[in-house]
């Protein structure tokens, strides 16, 4: 039987390669940080989710080592059998405090948090209204649920209102959105979303994976940015981006929602508990963020500097308040060539093109970190300018 399947798989893989969509894993020979080692050469990393520069922070490493000496390496159990230590509850409390919510539940990843949130809470009597650019984990989570599904164009409040009107016959309605959308870096208009939710009696859920630690006056996410505390019912997020970059996800929000997820959310019930080392380091992250806003301030300074310099150089960058800067090139082939040349110049970036982004919307996504210094940013900007001149690139939109 496998001979027949192998033929099918080989054909599928060949088609993926022919379409230019085959993903290669690029090996890093150093710790994850602003300057990394690839093939024995130091390059500057501008494609990591390491927004606060904490992935290799000495305080996190020391905290992980210390907690492993006290609590061991792994848990070898799910949470409800013998996989919950006191430190797991401490981290859940720290996350609740950070987001100003009532309770929190930890998962192995945010993919699991989003995959396990809908099915326990909603049935065919209910409606889930989702932004068209929401993360794949939200899409998959919704698919596991029998609720009626609606989708509105990215951040389009007119379409969202129409969906809410159509869903009025359903028992419960929930609006689901990313806080920051990963390809454009744009921020969901949470104030307007909450206004519509209140007008049409709907719940609100936001995935803070790319926004927590990044947006808002002190980096506390979209509810801080738009002052929607108390108006959002469910937050999901990750420990794998701004909060240290290791592993782990969470859902935080109303107490009764979290209580039911502990009873019925399958990724929580049937997955191993997060390892003590990750818990210890994550607790140190939230301690650091409570002590000072310096990392967030540095991130904002870096983002503004990069955007201003790139715009002055003539590049077309999507407007955003996040740490994701989409440098628009529009042409798919050009984005691939450009990214490859940038890597030759010692700048690690990635080109994105259809079908990951819409046709004729190819771009290079640059992710800024508090771990970058001015010299790193200047080198990246200089490389963009140099490669652009080499390729004869018109960096503004062809229709402008």
Which sequence ranges carry the predicted segments?
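Short loop-beta-helix segment that forms the pyridoxal 5′-phosphate
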Residues: 78-84, 92-116
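PLP-dependent aminotransferase class I/II
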Residues: 243-310, 315-318
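PLP-dependent enzyme catalytic core of the Aspartate aminotransferase-like
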Residues: 58, 62-66, 70, 93, ...
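Active-site PLP attachment segment
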Residues: 218, 224-260
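N-terminal "arm"/small-domain region of PLP-dependent enzymes with the aminotransferase-like
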Residues: 6-73, 202
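Active-site phosphate-binding strand-loop segment of PLP-dependent enzymes
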Residues: 150, 154-206
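Conserved PLP-binding catalytic core of the aspartate aminotransferase-like
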Residues: 297-306, 311-346, 356, 360-361, ...
């Amino acid at each position: 039987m496998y001979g027949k399947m192998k033929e099918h798989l080989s054909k599928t893989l060949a088609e993926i390669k022919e379409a230019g969509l085959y993903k290669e894993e690029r090996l890093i020979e150093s710790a994850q940080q602003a300057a990394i080692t690839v093939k024995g050469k130091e390059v500057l990393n501008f494609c990591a989710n390491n927004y606060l520069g904490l992935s290799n922070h000495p305080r996190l490493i020391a905290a992980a080592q210390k907690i492993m000496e006290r609590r061991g390496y792994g848990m070898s159990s799910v949470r409800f059998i013998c996989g919950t230590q006191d430190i797991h509850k401490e981290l859940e409390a720290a996350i609740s405090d950070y987001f100003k919510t009532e309770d929190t539940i930890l998962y192995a990843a945010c993919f699991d948090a989003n995959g396990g949130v809908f099915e326990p809470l909603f049935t065919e009597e209910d409606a889930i209204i989702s932004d068209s650019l929401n993360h794949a984990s939200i899409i998959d989570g919704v698919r596991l649920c029998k609720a009626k599904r609606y989708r509105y164009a990215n951040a389009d409040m007119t379409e969202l209102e129409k969906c809410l009107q159509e869903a009025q016959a359903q028992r419960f309605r929930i609006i689901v959105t990313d806080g920051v959308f990963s390809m454009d870096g744009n921020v969901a208009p949470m104030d307007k979303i909450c206004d519509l939710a209140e007008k049409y009696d709907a719940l609100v859920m936001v995935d803070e994976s790319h926004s927590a630690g990044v947006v808002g006056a002190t980096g506390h996410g979209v509810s801080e940015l738009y002052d929607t505390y108390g108006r959002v019912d469910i937050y999901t997020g990750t420990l794998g981006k701004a909060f240290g970059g290791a592993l782990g996800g969470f859902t935080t929000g109303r107490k009764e929602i979290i209580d039911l997820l502990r009873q019925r959310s399958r990724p929580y019930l049937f997955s191993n508990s997060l390892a003590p080392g990750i818990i210890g380091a994550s607790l140190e992250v939230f301690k650091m963020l409570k002590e000072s806003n310096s990392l967030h301030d540095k991130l904002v300074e870096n983002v503004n500097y990069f955007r201003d310099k790139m715009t002055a150089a003539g590049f077309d960058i999507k407007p955003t308040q996040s740490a994701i800067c989409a440098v628009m090139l529009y042409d798919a082939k050009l984005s691939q060539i450009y990214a490859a040349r940038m890597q030759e110049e010692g700048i690690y970036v990635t080109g994105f093109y259809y079908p990951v982004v819409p046709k004729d919307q190819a771009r290079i996504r640059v992710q800024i970190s508090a771990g970058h210094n001015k010299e790193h940013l200047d080198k990246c900007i200089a490389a963009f300018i140099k490669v652009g001149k080499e390729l004869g690139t018109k960096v503004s939109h062809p229709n402008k």
